[in-house]
From Swiss-Prot:
Keywords: Cytoplasmic vesicle, Endosome, Golgi apparatus, Lipid-binding, Membrane, Phosphoprotein
Start and end residues of each CRAL-TRIO domain: 96-257
Region annotation Disordered: where it falls in the sequence: 288-327
Main location: Golgi
Keyword Phosphoprotein included in the entry's annotation: yes
Sites of Phosphoserine modification: S325
Stated name of the protein: Clavesin-2
Organism ancestry: Eukaryota, Metazoa, Chordata, Craniata, Vertebrata
Amino acid sequence: MTHLQAGLSPETLEKARLELNENPDTLHQDIQEVRDMVITRPDIGFLRTDDAFILRFLRARKFHHFEAFRLLAQYFEYRQQNLDMFKSFKATDPGIKQALKDGFPGGLANLDHYGRKILVLFAANWDQSRYTLVDILRAILLSLEAMIEDPELQVNGFVLIIDWSNFTFKQASKLTPSMLRLAIEGLQDSFPARFGGIHFVNQPWYIHALYTVIRPFLKEKTRKRIFLHGNNLNSLHQLIHPEILPSEFGGMLPPYDMGTWARTLLDHEYDDDSEYNVDSYSMPVNEVDKELSPKSMKRSQSVVDPTALKRMDKSEEENMQPLLSLD
């Protein structure tokens, strides 16, 4: 076992070996294989390439080097293309803070029987007058950044339960194509988390309709892990034991305290340690080629082309028409 695996229990170490192809004897070599690919994408600013960071992506892609690198590249590319989302990427940002306080997301105290963290969302809690859907997405991404620092969760992953009770048609009409695309790209395509299940409960017909629209844009693996339970909580309990669920999901525990996870982040004033802004990319363009040469590349060094960091042109964005019209 290397120091990079020090945070794993013996059971999780064995799981990483069997399910993720993680081998302590080749771990540093695996990490370096991914790091060496950085020079193939000079258009992307890789703000972190240290061992522990790259290891998250290897675990998320079962130690397939190219797939891990592609996820790493998409992670930073997503942030470059959506700079405004990450300008004030911290728990004390007003929009993120309010979303967190309303339980976007929540995190249950107990892990499931596979050692996965259970995230919960109560969709109707969204207060449209105080924060946006983008703020909710930012709060979720920030929370995942904090949680994924736990090596146990890098291996075991997460499950998500979304309760759609009392989520109105008016709220659903705000889910525009561009908003849904932003969420899919940020969570499915650009983050090193393993999601073992996404469970919808108490969803109305218009959420079924929305899911039908976005389903073709989901990866096959993602589609297989989405469960639409409706009002049948027994089917949820077959996959997540009621002993660890709050009463809102027919569980045996007290009602969930929406502010639990918010207090955790705010107590630590958690923020992402990377500033995603144009000013932070200060390497002169004429030095990029020199810095990208294999001889000058160091372990854990990242090289940035400042010309790659541009906001998406408004004309390139999808239209903001709602998928569900109130007319």
